[in-house]
């Protein structure tokens, strides 16, 4: 995990922030907000462009987030636009920014206090501001989406991959002056800018340096000068000419064109995966219908009384770590949002990971060294863990301070009820069978009635494999039983979740704890198992030890919840378009030789307008929010908040491509 370097700040005599890394001011000493309006908003003619915009989203990219002043100014202006023109087809603003040296929460707060007109926007940003690692972090401000790509910009830009080609409407070419920050003002930047910009898209920058002008012209931008802000003589503006060609797709086997019509969307599911897909689609104004085969939502794997939320990190896969940390931070942001909307039991009091054997101890210590962030993951001695837990423990282990637990069944049911007030239609006791794509819609029959929707999303766990379109996708079911136990005087002192070869939660308000969970692969039996019930308790006592608080636990009521999780061997979920296995086998079984000979490769053939999110296994509370946001972004053809290498690792055809790209066969 690449640790970020935070900005080193000082303030000059005008109280303007100065970067000690670059020995340059963050914005004009004259007036930072007015400079932002003049250089970037007027330089890109944003107000006029917004009035003439015919798409639902407008995308701005910026080459240095800094103090966030440009973002606050344009977000506030967009809110004014939406209020002035409520019937405009333009509904959403995306602001994509890059930042190598982020400010701290306190630094942002100290600077933003001088701009009371942005108080609400600033408070929302600072509440969620938690730069931890390189890559994209998405923040929500109602109709404004902020994506900050932390880390080295020239390393991040290629990660805005094929799906980002020709998506940016306007650039705020900011950052410190070219003579102070020469590595940013580089040919690579201009090339990526041109690739990412729509035909007719524009840029504006405060500088008029000749090498910047020549660099932008060399890649294809039309460039002109205008009067600079305040005492500055000139600045540059420009656009991507109408005759420009769209960039080629670099990874056609992981690419599929967006759906042309995406207003009417059906989701098959009823658990946490379908919940967050529905949420993100509704936020984009789509008509969404959920089809659930049960009499109530959250009856399957999302129906547990308590579940832990924390990033389950790897010690040997940096990409895995980046993905799960992104998911964890985004999930925390969404939970804060729902805390204000619906009631559900939860407590983010931390999660302890017990080093219950030598192998686990070595793994946890290695993760702690790699993350280098004690706010995220810290190695602790037994005495410190005992303090966090509130009960005695002899093992060393790790502590995740911001993690915790929530009630999945309460959360999912309450959140779905809230989404119904926002337009979600829920159809219960409905089994979708044999859907077929006919005349531009996915259609099926149920009890003699025909159902049809433009888009179909399958978020239905292990039941996914019952569809013919699931051919070749290596999902498998895992039975799990979670035991519910009444508290004891000793056990009720437990303050946070403890994980070992199982887990135990603190007491809920009903006086019960959860111990989980059994793990039986390729088993879909939903009956209570007395053996698994006893095994859950035995794991606690064997891995933690014979303490007063682990003894005297009463299992006699046989209270337990059974669920079937859907999993994959690589322990990474799947999200994206559902691939047509038979066709892709014809397309790519010889891809190793095609690429070696530098032959053309076709775009992947997927089932049209058919998508999935699955394989969340026991990590759904952490991963579902970001997976839902990514899938909704893909469906509506708007920026996806994840790097291209992680996106490729999540796609449903990844397991086949890994083999085909090595020249191996897929049966």
From Swiss-Prot:
Q: Name one GO cellular component term.
A: cytoplasm
Organism domain of life: Bacteria
Q: Which UniProt keywords apply?
A: Cytoplasm, FAD, Flavoprotein, Methyltransferase, Multifunctional enzyme, Oxidoreductase, S-adenosyl-L-methionine, Transferase, tRNA processing
Q: Where is this region: FAD-dependent cmnm(5)s(2)U34 oxidoreductase?
A: 268-667
Which EC number(s) does the record attach to this protein? 2.1.1.61, 1.5.-.-
Q: What InterPro entries does the database record attribute to this sequence?
A: FAD-dep_OxRdtase (IPR006076), FAD/NAD-bd_sf (IPR036188), MnmC-like_methylTransf (IPR008471), SAM-dependent_MTases_sf (IPR029063), tRNA_MAMT_biosynth_bifunc_MnmC (IPR023032), tRNA_MNMC2 (IPR047785), tRNA_S-uridine_synth_MnmC_C (IPR017610)
Where's it found, cell-wise? Cytoplasm
Q: Region tRNA (mnm(5)s(2)U34)-methyltransferase: what ranges?
A: 1-241
Q: Which GO terms describe its biological process?
A: methylation; tRNA wobble uridine modification
Pfam families tied to this protein: DAO, Methyltransf_30
- The answer, when asked if Ligase is one of the entry's keywords, is no
Mainly localized where? cytoplasm
Per its UniProt record, the required cofactor names are:
FAD
- Reactions it catalyzes: 5-aminomethyl-2-thiouridine(34) in tRNA + S-adenosyl-L-methionine = 5-methylaminomethyl-2-thiouridine(34) in tRNA + S-adenosyl-L-homocysteine + H(+)
Task: Output one GO MF annotation.
Answer: flavin adenine dinucleotide binding
Member of which family? In the N-terminal section; belongs to the methyltransferase superfamily. tRNA (mnm(5)s(2)U34)-methyltransferase family. In the C-terminal section; belongs to the DAO family.
- What does this protein's UniProt record list under function? Catalyzes the last two steps in the biosynthesis of 5-methylaminomethyl-2-thiouridine (mnm(5)s(2)U) at the wobble position (U34) in tRNA. Catalyzes the FAD-dependent demodification of cmnm(5)s(2)U34 to nm(5)s(2)U34, followed by the transfer of a methyl group from S-adenosyl-L-methionine to nm(5)s(2)U34, to form mnm(5)s(2)U34.
Listed NCBIfam families: MnmC_Cterm, PRK01747.1-2, PRK01747.1-5, tRNA_MNMC2
User: What name appears for this protein in its UniProt entry?
Assistant: tRNA 5-methylaminomethyl-2-thiouridine biosynthesis bifunctional protein MnmC
Organism of origin: Haemophilus ducreyi (strain 35000HP / ATCC 700724)
